[in-house]
Amino acid sequence: MTRYTLRALATQWRAWSGTVAVLALAAGLINVCLVHRMTVTRPDVVAAARAAGVDPAELVVPGISVAFYTAMVTIPVVAVVGQSCVQALRTSWALWRLAGALPRQVLAAVLATVAVLGLVACVPGILLGQVAAQPFASVLTRLAAARMGWIEVAQTPTTLLLTVVIVVAVAVLGAVGPACAAVRTPAVEAVRDAAPGGRRRMGVGRRILAGVWAHACAGQLFVAFLAPPGRKIDGWPTGGGQAILASLLLAVLVVLLAPALIPRLLRLWSAPLARLGGPWLIARRSALWRSESSASAIGLLALAISFTAALTTSLATVQAVVEAARLNVAINQVDSLVLAAILGAMALLGAVAVVGMSSRSRQREFAVLRCAGSTVRGVCRQVVVEAALYVGTALLISLVPLVVTTAGESLFYARAGMPLVVRPGVGPVLLVALLSFLTLTAVLLAPIPGATRTPIGAVLAAE
C-alpha cells in the first residue's frame, strides 16, 4: 500500500497543493514561536536579561501571547483543510475499495497520505521559519523590553522535531473523521461521484468538543463584560483584552459548528435571492449542494474576518481612549497589524484551498449548464454570485465577534474611569471581505477555461 499511496500523491498533486501550502505556512508560524520560546529560556539569554535589569519572564510573555493567537487560528485551519482534502478525494479511496483493498488498508493509506503531506510541507515551513525567526524575536523583544537589545536565535533539533510533530499530528487528527468515512464509502462512488450535498452530521467527538468550547465562550463572555478592571499603571488599566479572547473563542466555535450551523444560515439569508432567478438561483443551489465544503470554507473565511475585526477594533478603541483621555501612552500597532495580516491570510488561504478542491466536480457542473443552454458569460456570473454568497455569509457570522469586541472593550475602559469611546473596525473588516471575495472569485473562475475547451461529451462521459 505504500507504493500506491506515493503514486496517488504523485498523480493527484494538484489536489494536494492547497493543503501543502496551508501546512507549510502553519509549520512556519509554529516554528518561529517554538524558536522564540527556546531562545528566551536559554541560560545565556536569561543571564543577559537580568544583567540589563529585565525580568526574564517579561521576555516569555509576548511569545506566549502570540503563540496562543497563532494556535487559535492555525489548529482549526490545518484540521479543516486536512479533512476537506480527504473528503474531496473520497472517490479515489472508493476506487481502492473496488480494487480489493481492505477497509483497514484504506484507512491506513489515507492517514499515511496526510502524514506524508505534513512531512513534505514542513520542509518549506521550516525554511520560512529560519528566515522569519530572527525578525520575529526582535519584534517580541522590543515589545517586552526595549533595553534588552539584540537576541540571536538559532534552530535546534528540539524545535525542528516539535514543529514536525505538531503539524503532522494536527493534520492527521483532522483527517481521522473523513478517513473513517472513506472506509465506509460504497463502491458505487468509484464509478460516479456522489453529490457532495446533503446534511453532514457532526461526530460525537466534535459535538463534545463544541459543547466544551461553548461553555468556555460563555465563561469568557462573562469575564469580558462583568470582570472589574485591574489596577492602573501610569494611568492605564490592566486586565484588558478579554473581549478579544471572547471574540476569537466564538469564531473558533463557528468552525466547530460549521457543518450544522452554516448551511442553515446560508439557506436562510439567501432565500430572497432565489427569487431573482438566473445566476442567483443557480449560484445559491450550487453553494447549498456543496454544503459540506462550502461550510468549511465559510467557517475559515469567518475566522479570518473575525480575527481581523477583533484585533483592529481593539487597537482602534485603545488609540481613541488614549487620545480622549490625553494620556502619554505609546501604542505600537504595527506589530499587531502584521500578526493580524499573517493569521488572517492563513485562514483565507485555508478557505481558498477548500474551495479549490471542488474544481473537478465544477467542471462537470459547468458542462451540464452549457448543455442546458447556458453561456460562458452566464457561468461566470454564477461563479461571482457564489463567491459573494460565501463572503456574505462569513460577514454575517463575523458581526458577532465585531459587536462583542466593540462593546466589551468600550465598556471595559468606561468601567476603569476612562472615556466611553466606540470604534468598531468596520473599514479593515470590509477590506478583508473584499480581498476574500476577489480571491474566491479568481479560484472559482479558474476551472472555466479548461471546462470550455473540453468537449461537453468528454466531461459528461464520467457521469
What is each model feature region?
Residues 16-20, 74, 110-128, 199-214, ...:
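Selective transmembrane-helix segments that form parts of the transport pathway or gating/packing helices
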Residues 42, 46-200:
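Membrane-anchoring hydrophobic segments
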Residues 12-17, 76-115, 349-391:
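Interfacial "coupling" helices/loops that link adjacent transmembrane helices in transporter permeases
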Residues 2-36, 58, 71-74, 162-175, ...:
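Alpha-helical transmembrane segments, especially those used as permease/efflux helices
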Residues 50-72, 144-176, 197-212, 240, ...:
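Conserved transmembrane alpha-helices of multi-pass membrane proteins
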Residues 30-42, 82, 115-145, 159-184, ...:
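Small-residue-rich transmembrane alpha-helices
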Residues 1-75, 84, 155-158, 325-337:
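Membrane transport/envelope proteins' first extracytoplasmic loop
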Residues 3, 185-200, 452-463:
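Short cytosolic juxtamembrane segments of multi-pass membrane proteins
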